[in-house]
Amino acid sequence: MAKEKKEEVKEEEVSEATSTEGSTDVESTNNDDLTTETQATTALDDIKKVEAERDELSDKYIRAQAEIVNMRRRNEKEQASLIKYDGQKLAKAILPALDNLERALAVESASEQLLKGVKMVQTDLLKALKENHVAEIEAEGQAFDPNMHQAVQTVPADDDHPADTVVQVLQKGYILKDRVLRPAMVIVAQ
C-alpha cells in the first residue's frame, strides 16, 4: 500500500508538472506571438521612418540639382551679357569727344584746314563706334520713347509735329547693340 501511495503521489506530481509545463508552453507561445507582433509593428514603423527620410533626402537632392542648373544658366547669361557689352565703358567715354568735334564743325569761322582735320577725326571716331556696334538713336520726327529719349523741353503740337513727337534733337543719343548708352536729349511736342 505504501508503494501504491508513492506511485499515486508521483503520478499526481507528474500530472501537475505536465499541466504546469503545458500552461507555461501556452503562455510562452502567446508571449512569443505578442513579441513577434510588436517586433513586426516596430519594424514597419522603422521602415516608414526610413522611407520618409529617403523621400526627404531625395527631394532635397532634386532641389539642389535644380538650383545648380539655375545658377549655371544665370552665370552663362551674365557671361554672354559681359561679352556682348564689353565696349560700353569705352564708348561712353568717347561720346563727349564726338560731341565736341560736332560743335567745332558747326562753327563757320574756322579755317578750312582745321575743319578738314576735325571732320577726319569725327569720321574715324564714328567708324570705330560703328564697328563696335554703337549706333546713333534716330530721334527727330520719331515718336517720343522715354527709353531712348530724354525730354528736356516741350513745345505746343501743330500740324507738322503731332503730340508726343520729337521736334528737335539737342544732343544725340547712342545705343550699343540693344542697350542705351546715352538717351537723346530732345524737345517734344505736347
From Swiss-Prot:
Location within or outside the cell: Cytoplasm
Transmembrane segments: none
Keyword Chaperone: yes
Classification via PROSITE patterns: GRPE
A single GO BP: protein folding
Region spans: Disordered: 1-40
The keyword Transcription regulation is annotated on this UniProt entry: no
Residue ranges, compositional bias (Polar residues): 22-40
One CC-aspect GO term: cytoplasm
Annotated GO MF terms: adenyl-nucleotide exchange factor activity; protein homodimerization activity; protein-folding chaperone binding; unfolded protein binding
This protein's UniProt keywords: Chaperone, Cytoplasm, Stress response
Domain of life: Bacteria
UniProt xrefs under PANTHER family: GRPE PROTEIN, GRPE PROTEIN HOMOLOG, MITOCHONDRIAL
Family recorded in the similarity comment: Belongs to the GrpE family.
Summary of the function given for this chain in its UniProt record: Participates actively in the response to hyperosmotic and heat shock by preventing the aggregation of stress-denatured proteins, in association with DnaK and GrpE. It is the nucleotide exchange factor for DnaK and may function as a thermosensor. Unfolded proteins bind initially to DnaJ; upon interaction with the DnaJ-bound protein, DnaK hydrolyzes its bound ATP, resulting in the formation of a stable complex. GrpE releases ADP from DnaK; ATP binding to DnaK triggers the release of the substrate protein, thus completing the reaction cycle.
Assembly and interaction partners: Homodimer.
Protein name (database record): Protein GrpE
Gene: grpE
